[in-house]
Amino acid sequence: MRTQVTLGKEELELLDRAAKASGASRSELIRRAIHRAYGTGSKQERLAALDHSRGSWRGRDFTGTEYVDAIRGDLNERLARLGLA
């Protein structure tokens, strides 16, 4: 089935970066995201995903606190631009 979805510039840029990094199409990434968000993946699939993410912070030159602060800063800037802060 085919459907049409309107994305903002930021969402499209995120999707394009993920597509380039993974080699998957936009459509495939959207299908995967829908499956993760709304699907009924098995316990084994969820555990495999957790196992796959192990060590993802290895080699980073910043702490978790610094990362969260940076994200919050970006969020606050976006909210201010939208007049929501």
From Swiss-Prot:
Q: Which Pfam families match?
A: RHH_1
User: Which superkingdom does the taxonomy of this entry point to?
Assistant: Bacteria
Q: Does the keyword NADP apply?
A: no
Its GO biological process terms? positive regulation of growth; regulation of DNA-templated transcription
| SUPFAM superfamilies cross-referenced by the UniProt entry | Ribbon-helix-helix
Query: Which InterPro entries does UniProt cross-reference here?
Result: Arc_rbn_hlx_hlx, CopG, Ribbon_hlx_hlx
Keywords for this entry? Toxin-antitoxin system
Q: What's this chain's function? A: Antitoxin component of a type II toxin-antitoxin (TA) system. Upon expression in M.smegmatis neutralizes the effect of cognate toxin VapC19.
Under what name is this protein listed? Putative antitoxin VapB19
Q: What is the lineage of its organism?
A: Bacteria, Bacillati, Actinomycetota, Actinomycetes, Mycobacteriales
Gene coding for it: vapB19
